[in-house]
């Protein structure tokens, strides 16, 4: 049996941009194939701010595995049981919000990795293998190697500890939650502010030092994304289903109104 591979990790390992699309209000599996056809590498299935359930997450995740796009799930802060259930349902990784310290990053890895790297419990019949029977030792080793653990840094405290967070074995991506960071800094929505730029520099430097991938979310302006990619960002949340649909629909309506 071929070993399952995480397409988002593969894209990052090749030195490319791993492009993600947020899933907030889509609840059916079609979103996975649509976003793969659009050219994205991973889904940001949002259980922190979206109304999705673990059931809908599993359905989307299984469709994503078949389509060749990586399902990554953001759970509410500290919800490790939800995180491991999302992984058992087909997730290729967990995005944990508000990781402020290296100790929190270590706890995250401990809960999400199988032994000997952590203490996650294993179950048979995993979607990553098409529900086929696989030796537990083989599944644990492969999934430990292929999953992505993403620590979101969204406060000045987290930025100050970015080097220590990036140094934690098992953390793959340190991702700036730009909107929340600007809010915490008292500069809400000013995503090009000098303090935000300095935070990006700090995270990029920490990731380069510890051979991790720097990531970003919450930035919609393409030119600003271009600027941060030029600084070294590689794991890019490109938007979410709600905003993309609303914006495209508004543009279409304006164009049609202009016909008369």
Where are these regions (language model features)?
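C-terminal helical cap(s) of enzyme catalytic domains, especially alpha/beta-barrels
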Residues: 60, 102-118, 243-260
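Glycine-rich beta-to-alpha transition loops that act as phosphate-gripper elements at the mouths
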Residues: 23-27, 74-80, 98-100, 152-157, ...
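Conserved N-terminal beta1-alpha1 strand-loop-helix module at the mouth
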Residues: 1-78, 110, 149, 168-171
């Amino acid at each position: 049996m071929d070993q399952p591979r995480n397409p988002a990790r593969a894209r990052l390992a090749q030195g490319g941009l791993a492009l993600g699309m947020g899933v907030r209000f889509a609840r059916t599996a079609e979103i996975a194939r649509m976003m793969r056809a659009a050219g994205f590498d991973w889904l940001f299935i949002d259980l922190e701010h979206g109304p999705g359930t673990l059931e809908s997450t599993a359905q989307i995740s299984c469709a994503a595995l078949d389509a060749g796009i990586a399902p990554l799930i953001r759970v509410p802060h500290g919800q490790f049981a939800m995180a491991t259930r999302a992984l058992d349902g087909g997730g290729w990784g967990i995005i944990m919000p508000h990781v402020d310290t290296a100790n929190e990053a270590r706890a995250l890895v401990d809960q999400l990795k199988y032994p000997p790297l952590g203490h996650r419990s294993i179950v048979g019949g995993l979607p990553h293998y098409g529900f086929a029977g696989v030796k537990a030792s083989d599944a644990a080793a492969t999934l430990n190697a292929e999953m992505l653990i993403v620590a979101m840094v969204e406060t000045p405290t987290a930025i100050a500890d970015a080097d220590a967070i990036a140094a934690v074995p098992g953390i793959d991506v340190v991702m700036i939650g730009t909107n929340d960071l600007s809010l915490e800094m008292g500069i809400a929505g000013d995503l090009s502010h000098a303090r935000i730029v300095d935070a990006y520099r700090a995270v990029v430097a920490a990731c380069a030092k510890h051979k991790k991938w720097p990531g970003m979310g919450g930035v919609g302006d393409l030119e600003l994304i271009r600027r941060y990619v030029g600084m070294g960002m590689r794991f890019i949340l490109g938007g979410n289903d709600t905003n993309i649909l609303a914006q495209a629909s508004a543009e279409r309506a304006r164009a049609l109104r202009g016909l008369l």
